[in-house]
Amino acid sequence: RIDAAGLLVIPGIIDSHMHASSWLAGRKSYKMLALAGVTTALEMAGPLEDVKEGLREDGSGITVGCLEMIRPGWNVQSASPKAEELSEVIFNALDRGAFGVKLLGGHYPLTPEASAQLIRLCDNNGVYLGIHAGSTEQGSNINGVKEIVDCAEGHAFHLAHMNAYCRGNILDVPQEVAFVEKILQSHPEIDSESYLSPINGCSGKCIDGVPESGITRNCLHSHGYEETQQGLREAIEDGFARVHLQKTDSVVLAEPNEGLRLWLEQNTNASMSFAVNPSLSNFYFATQKRPNGTFLSDSFCTDGGGIPRNVILENGLSLVKFGAITLKEFVFKSSTSAANLLGLANKGRLVVGADADITVVDYAKQKAVHAFS
């Protein structure tokens, strides 16, 4: 028996985009998410077998689906795979239990032509596709968003973390936000989410003196650092790049000296975060609505898990207290709409016959007290 007097009891929070594999975020993700009130989550990269193993050994009881990444040099030979190769990878992933597949365009891109082929294959076959915009031609920015929507030619897909494309890298942030809003308003077939944290998450791995991830290079460039291993080292020393430190039950951002030591000990293959997300774009995509009253971006996510930014509840309730959204709207966007986005008919609502996913919240402290899944 749980005494919930004075607490909020809401449908279990659904994180429509997180990371939990050892490749990016680590297996402490599952406990970190549960402690943040999350009861259901979509892991958006894989590798699938690593996620399965992590759930078996370190799962916290939350429900998890996984999108298998499409990554050149890993499960496709190059950045321009043909339809036959893509089909083989897609259906192999589904046969092994994947919820769908993910294009990591901002980190490990395909050509625009291959990206378009992937979108057509998935939509025509009813396969769930998540996309981080970006290609071999355009980066993870507003130009990448326009390009991937053009590539889709009206086909549906899930476009990840709308706030993360509006960091002022092409235009001023307000102009970028308006640019992306116009695209979303014109393409209701595209589902999307956004997150509420100032930090991102990426890899510090370097190959031949250059950061492997396009996102890492973008972050360095945006703040005047060289897009090299030396530039990344300087960013770590300055505290701009914060290496992830594994503690007993969580992941935290290391202080500069310790972060540099971890990065070097791991031969640069360490995950890290940069404080690159403007509050304007975070706020806008969390609250903005379409003319018909529905939210412009469908759901909240963390893009976290093992990346220490699991703040749907903490920062989402700040929006409620600020008056930007109502408590009912917070519940809708953090659970009901996310369930609809993922096709989870038995989640996102507290009704007889639905899954008994419940988050119990201390509203004053903006913290989860219990999470049942």
Show where each model-derived region lies.
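Histidine/acidic residue-rich metal-binding segments in metalloenzymes
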Residues: 83-100, 109-267, 276-296
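Divalent-metal coordination cores built from histidine and acidic residues
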Residues: 26-108, 120-127
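His/Asp/Glu-enriched, well-ordered alpha-helical/loop segment
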Residues: 280-361
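Short active-site segment of divalent metal-dependent hydrolases/proteases
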Residues: 20-21, 135, 306
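Short, Lys/Arg- and Gly-enriched loop/turn segments at beta-strand edges
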Residues: 365-371
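Divalent metal-coordination and catalytic microenvironments
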Residues: 6, 17, 37, 64, ...
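Hydrophobic faces of well-ordered beta-strands that scaffold small-molecule active sites
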Residues: 12-18, 41-43, 64-69, 101-103, ...
